[in-house]
A protein has these predicted regions:
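Long, charged, low-complexity intrinsically disordered regions
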Residues: 1-98
C-alpha cells in the first residue's frame, strides 16, 4: 500500500465527483439503496436541486420497490412518480424535494 493515497485514486476522480440531478442504480443491490438515496438527497439539497431522477431499471422491480420505500420515509421528499416515457418511463422515478 502506498504512503500517498492520492496515487491510488484514478485520475478522473482526483478533481472530485460531479454531483448531478440523476442517480443511476444499475449494478447496485437492494440493501445498498437506502444509504445511496439518503446521501444523494442530502447532496442535492446542499446544491439547491429540487427535482431529481433515480434510474432503477425495468427488470424485476426489486430496486424500484426499495427506492419507493426509502422515498416514502424521507422527510425531504414532497412527491415522487414514474418518469415520462422520454426519461425512462417506469424504469426511472422522478423525485420532487421540499
Amino acid at each position: 500500500m502506498s504512503k500517498n493515497k492520492n496515487n491510488d485514486i484514478p485520475e478522473e476522480f482526483k478533481q472530485g465527483i460531479r454531483i448531478t440531478d440523476t442517480l443511476d442504480l444499475h449494478g447496485f443491490f437492494p440493501e445498498q439503496i437506502p444509504d445511496l438515496i439518503e446521501d444523494f438527497i442530502e447532496n442535492a439539497l446542499d446544491l439547491g436541486l429540487k427535482t431529481l431522477k433515480i434510474i432503477h431499471g425495468k427488470g424485476k422491480s426489486r430496486l424500484k420497490f426499495e427506492v419507493h420505500q426509502v422515498l416514502k420515509k424521507s422527510p425531504h421528499v414532497q412527491k415522487f412518480y414514474n418518469a415520462s416515457s422520454e426519461s425512462g418511463g417506469w424504469g426511472a422515478t422522478m423525485v420532487e424535494l421540499k
